[in-house]
Design a protein with these regions (language model features):
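Loop-helix junctions at membrane interfaces
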Residues: 1-204
Length: 204
């Protein structure tokens, strides 16, 4: 009898784990869908006009910076990736641009969620540092590929190769993506407000 009890233990644990994951799946999908829509809106509609070379400042960073702290990694990563892709695809269709812009914004933004999530158990100061690091990553994730694409005339970025000096000059405006740092206090404020409202650190 003892042997039978021992052998059935892992099976019961495995079954309960599967059941829990199955139960959590609708919530996970709903969260990702909701936040993806929010991210898409922040990439397309919710933006502030700015003078060149910025042209505009989107509100999307507020959402994915805060969500990456408060919610599970899968939620923050996939909602940032999908929402940014959908939003940028709309921008390309409506305002013009190249399809690679969609891949580019996912490449730049989605890892930000992972960077911030890594430090979400830390103090407020660590959260701020993680958001700064994420924004620096985003900036260079835009800048270095664009520099290469302009230099070698890849993906229709230029009719003729611009050379590395010319490519650097054309991609230089990407460095102004660092303006997203202004959203960090807003994101931190949102995190603090949600934590106080729900009396919990994370909405896992």
């Amino acid at each position: 009898m003892a042997t039978a009890d021992l052998s059935s233990g892992p099976k019961l644990n495995s079954s309960s784990t599967i059941a829990r994951r199955t139960t959590d799946l609708p919530l996970l999908v709903a969260q990702i869908a909701s936040f993806s829509g929010l991210m898409a809106a922040g990439t397309t509609i919710l933006r502030i006009p700015a003078p060149p070379p910025l042209f505009e400042i989107t509100l999307a960073p507020v959402f994915y910076l805060a969500i990456s702290v408060l919610f599970p990694r899968r939620v923050s990563f996939w909602s940032t990736a999908l929402g940014s892709a959908i939003g940028e695809a709309i921008n390309v269709v409506v305002y013009g641009g190249f399809p690679i812009y969609v891949a580019g914004i996912v490449w730049a933004r989605a890892p930000e969620a992972l960077i911030i999530y890594k430090f979400r158990n830390g103090s407020t100061r660590m959260l701020i540092i993680s958001m700064v690091l994420a924004t620096i990553y985003e900036t260079f994730a835009f800048f270095f590929p664009d520099w290469l694409f302009y230099s070698l005339a890849l993906f229709s970025y230029s009719d003729v190769p611009q050379g590395f000096a010319g490519g650097f000059a054309l991609a230089f405006s990407d460095l102004f993506t660092m303006v997203d740092l202004v959203w960090i206090p807003v994101a931190i404020g949102a995190v603090v407000a949600v934590r106080k409202a729900f009396r919990t650190r994370f909405l896992d």
